[in-house]
Amino acid sequence: MSTELENVKKQEEEYSASNIQVLEGLEAVRKRPAMYIGDIGEKGLHHLVYEVVDNSIDEALAGYCTDIDVTINEDNSITVRDNGRGIPTDYHEKEGKSALEVVLTVLHAGGKFDKGSYKVSGGLHGVGVSCVNALSTLLIAEIRSRDGKVYRQTYSKGAPTSQVEVIGECSDRGTTITFKPDESIFTLTTEYKYDILANRLRELAFLNKGIRLNLYDKRKDDEGKTREDHFYSEEGLKEFVQYLDATRGTPIIDQIIYLDTERNGVPVEVAMQYNDSFSENVHSYVNNINTIESGTHLTGFRRALTRTLKKYAEDSGMLAKLKFDINGDDFREGLTAVVSVKVQEPQFEGQTKTKLGNDEVSAAVDQAMSAALGHYLEENPKDAKAIVSKVILAATARHAARHAREMVQRKTVLSGAGLPGKLADCSSRDRSIAEIFFVEGDSAGGTAKSGRDRNFQAIMPLRGKILNIEKAQEHRMWENEEIKNMFTALGVTIGTEEDSKALNLEKLRYDKIIIMTDADVDGSHIATLMLTFFFRKMKELIENGHVYIATPPLYLVKKGKQERYCWTEKERDTITAEFGKGAHVQRYKGLGEMNAHQLWETTMNPDTRILRQVNIENAAEADRIFSMLMGDEVPPRREFIEKNAHYANIDA
């Protein structure tokens, strides 16, 4: 037996109660759950699953687990099963109870804090499965142990309701956790969304090549069918970039640039590809956590990319005739990249604690990236020339866009920030209560103007479909009248004291920006164009929770003097049955079919309306979907629409 295999065997045998370290008690979790899982809404609900899956991923990173199954049960409980070593069940001397009970009842207890057990660990909050236990009315832990026995213990709201019991024998090893979230804590929803879990498991499969992640949904849809997906990646980040790039135009280089190395004790993995699109699509991860606020690892990547490409471009003489400087943005136009690092003790900063602060990681990524990219450019001169040509085109377009933008912003200042003529503004200047509706067409705009509360609601009619930002270079955006009017109406500009390219929200005039369109194909297209614009050019508005979609009712059911609005077919059928014989159903195909009073009552009145807040649960997946919906590739768009058509309710 080799020394390496002996060490793995020894470590496997020694993973027991003594490896479990305890940092903190569980008392506070039920009192302040948002402190531990982010929030008690949909995001926090799904975070419970991630905490349990992270334990299994940690086992995989340590080399002991290859398969992880996640099942959404019919009652919206979750079961996570892995084939790792199994949580130890032996007696924990210091705590006076089994190691299993320590892991499940003490916050931050786990082998991941013991450097002898796990080298690195995921888990943004790092609170472990005990937090899941505290926030569940039922948790069942089943351990297939190394002694060939199956151990079981049950819990409720963090407290054990049984002893650790032997319930059978087994020939394999692993952990199975089943939990049911507490409805008294998750008051908004306890219903798991398949797509949110699927996106995260897909992401984890790409980030951890060689691990099989399976998702099963035992809940039946309207046709009596269940769902399942299986995620496995042989090539990891290379396949991740291919997946993200499949909807983003045509690659301009022959192969994906890839590196997987270690610098100064920091494992660094990068995959990148250039295509002919006009936007940057770079995603970064630390220990499998999506660092949406970037951090030192991304700083190192960008610095190395700019410096290495610029040096090659200068040495090749391709920049000799350029009459203006190129900058970092030019080197990243059309770039799709994933940067993943593993850090033993990550320091997270920023508003959402998703910004890496470790200084040593920047140098590690910079060194690794410089060496790999420099070698690639020398070995592949054809690809190198294609990349530099793309950079020069990007610089030329940026120069034209800056000139167009300055003209627009200068004109706005000189004209005293005159608002667009079509804007029916609200009288309040209190941004915290003000809201603006972007409405499809002058007809619906007229109804909305009549129905609104002019004290705090502004109406901005849109003339037809706005520019498709996904396919347009930036200077075209600044030449587009509708988009210029949107910037002016919102009071948003480009450039802050810290960053001349950042979105400036200081003079944002409204707290809520509401997209209100018809429930038909054209209306959905306009809404998607608007969302693409906000996602690509004003992402901070989405991240700060300002963007919403109005949901007008689809039906009005009437019988005599009784009338009820319905937003779904199921609701319509229930009300129709309730009203009985003689009920009349009206289908609303457009906002213009409602009068001002009806539009106010159903869609604009804060007390009765239904607004859907736009948020970015998964930045990489959101980017891919926008590229697919608004890009040039038809087959993936058709496949997406066919797969998701039953979630939509629009008339073709």
Please name every model-derived segment:
Residues 1-19, 26, 48-50, 58-60, ...:
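GHKL-family ATPase ATP-binding module
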Residues 31-50:
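Conserved short strand/loop->alpha-helix "switch" segment adjacent to the catalytic nucleotide/phosphoryl-transfer site
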Residues 36-40, 111-122:
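Glycine-rich ATP-lid/hinge loop adjacent to the conserved G-boxes
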Residues 86-91:
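A short glycine-centered beta->alpha linker in the GHKL/HATPase_c
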Residues 92-93, 100:
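Short adenine-binding "F-helix/F-box" segment of the Bergerat
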Residues 396-415, 430-435, 446, 450-452, ...:
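C-terminal interaction appendages of subunits in large macromolecular complexes
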